[in-house]
Structure formats: structure tokens, C-alpha cells
Amino acid sequence: MAKAKKGFSRSDRVAEQIQRELAELTRKGLKDPRAGWITITAVEVTRDYSHAKVYYTVMVDSTREATQEALDSSAGYLRNELGRAIKMFSMPQLHFVYDDSVERGMHLTSLINQVAREDAEKFGEAAAGEAEGEGKAE
């Protein structure tokens, strides 16, 4: 009898656990004053678990570069703390990447809203012109 396929791979579960632990560590354990309000948005782990890309955002965009420096300099400490919290043969090297998906999403939303406004103005004027034209034809 074949085993039922699980919904998530082991690397997905490891990435999720790393994300949870890093969120807690950056909130409580990261004492670097350069680090702003950090949100860990996603973690991707390589198949061999040797590297992990950690995606993050910050509340204040002006602290973005300083936060990147703080995370890069704290990577060893965070990896060590992860090793204490998560029992793995080898903890992956952490690579921090700023997640600009929220900014891209807001930009796309503003573009969609702009086009919708332009269409409403364009078609609203055309519809008003048609209504006036119908009244004159009688």
C-alpha cells in the first residue's frame, strides 16, 4: 500500500520553524541598535540545508540599510541561537534579503487604481455625452 503524500516537504517545515524562531529572536534577542522593527516574511532553505535565505521587512524604510547591516553582523549569533532552539544536524548559513514584495504590491495597486480612475473619467464622459445626444435626437 502506497503512503499518502504529505502536504509539505521537510525543507518547508524546517523553513517555517526557522522563520518562527527568527521572528522571536529578532524581537527579543537582537540587541543591535541599528536594527529597526523587523518582520521575518519568509525563509527558503536549500535542499541540502546548508543555506537559508531569510526575507524581512522593516516598519520604517529609512532604517532599511542599517537593519541589513545589523542582521548581517548578527547572522552568526542568530544561527547559534537557532541551533539551540531547533535540533538539526547542521544549521544553515543565514542570508538576509530585504523583501520588497509589499512595496511592489502597493505600487501595482496604485497603478490599477490610476487606470480605473482614468477609465471611469473617460467612459463616464462618453456615457454622459451619449445621454445628452439621445435627448437631442428626439
Swiss-Prot record:
Query: Where is it predominantly found?
Result: cytoplasm
Q: Where in the cell is it found?
A: Cytoplasm
What is the annotated role of this protein in its UniProt record?
Answer: One of several proteins that assist in the late maturation steps of the functional core of the 30S ribosomal subunit. Associates with free 30S ribosomal subunits (but not with 30S subunits that are part of 70S ribosomes or polysomes). Required for efficient processing of 16S rRNA. May interact with the 5'-terminal helix region of 16S rRNA.
Show the Pfam families listed in the entry.
RBFA
**Record's keyword terms, sorted:** Cytoplasm, Ribosome biogenesis
A single Gene Ontology CC annotation of this entry is:
cytosol
SUPFAM superfamilies, per this entry? Ribosome-binding factor A, RbfA
What name does UniProt use for this protein? Ribosome-binding factor A
Source taxon at top rank = Bacteria
One Gene Ontology BP term is:
maturation of SSU-rRNA
Q: Which family does it belong to?
A: Belongs to the RbfA family.
Q: Which InterPro entries match?
A: KH_dom-like_a/b, RbfA, RbfA_dom_sf, Ribosome-bd_factorA_CS
The GO terms this record gives for MF are: ribosomal small subunit binding
Originating organism: Chromobacterium violaceum (strain ATCC 12472 / DSM 30191 / JCM 1249 / CCUG 213 / NBRC 12614 / NCIMB 9131 / NCTC 9757 / MK)
Subunit comment: Monomer. Binds 30S ribosomal subunits, but not 50S ribosomal subunits or 70S ribosomes.
